[in-house]
């Protein structure tokens, strides 16, 4: 009958669309997996080249009307007993960290060779609680210059040597260019 033929055509079309969607999602998953593994690779190499104890990326979201920020990627020095802070830094409301976040989005670099120089009490308390003594932030932007994230490196000793400082800054600059 006409109804059965129409249902059969509908089922065939639905199955075709399902297969197409699965293929597209499979491609996207594979592509995302490649991108994510590249980013983790860059972070891993950076951590060792800079002798950092923790390296990661903070990202605002949603990008259209930034309300939150989260630690989306993080590498921690292995076998050091250092705990990851990625789980703690998820869906932080920007309104609660407004001074810090506005600076992350506006300044290319925020560098604290000694956290005692951090004026934002909330950021200071968080860094101090985690045992951080020096922290470097490098803003990441898209092709239009809009803020899409911040690369950070944390050190458990103050960074005072100018050669080490220059090495860290150079390494972060190179990785920022690769990640953006």
Q: What do the predicted segments below correspond to?
A:
Residues 147-180:
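Juxtadomain coupling helices with adjacent low-complexity linkers
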Residues 75-130:
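Regulatory sensory and allosteric helical modules in signal-transduction proteins
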Residues 1-77, 172-175, 179-180:
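Intrinsically disordered, low-complexity terminal regulatory regions
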Residues 61-62, 116, 154-157:
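Short, flexible beta-strand-to-coil junctions
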Residues 63-69, 79-85, 143-147:
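Short, solvent-exposed loop/turn segments that connect beta-strands within catalytic domains
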Residues 133-142:
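A short, aliphatic-rich beta-strand micro-motif
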Residues 131-133, 152:
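Short, solvent-exposed, Trp/other aromatic-anchored flexible loops in extracytoplasmic proteins
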Residues 51-53, 131, 147:
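Short loop/turn motifs at secondary-structure junctions
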């Amino acid at each position: 009958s006409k109804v059965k033929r129409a249902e059969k055509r509908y089922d065939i079309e639905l199955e075709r669309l399902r297969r197409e969607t699965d293929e597209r999602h499979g491609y996207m998953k594979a592509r995302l997996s490649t991108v994510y593994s590249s980013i983790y690779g860059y972070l891993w190499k950076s951590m060792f080249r800079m002798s950092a104890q923790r390296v990661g990326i903070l990202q605002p979201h949603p990008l259209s009307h930034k309300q939150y920020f989260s630690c989306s990627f993080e590498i921690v020095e292995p076998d050091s007993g250092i705990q990851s802070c990625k789980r703690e830094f998820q869906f932080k409301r920007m309104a609660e960290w407004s001074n810090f976040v506005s600076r992350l989005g506006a300044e290319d670099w925020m560098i604290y060779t000694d956290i005692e120089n951090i004026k934002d009490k909330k950021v200071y308390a968080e860094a101090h609680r985690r045992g951080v003594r020096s922290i470097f932030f490098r803003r990441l932007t898209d092709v239009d210059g809009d803020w899409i994230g911040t690369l950070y490196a944390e050190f458990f000793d103050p960074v005072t040597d100018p050669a080490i400082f220059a090495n860290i800054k150079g390494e972060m600059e190179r990785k920022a260019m690769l990640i953006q």
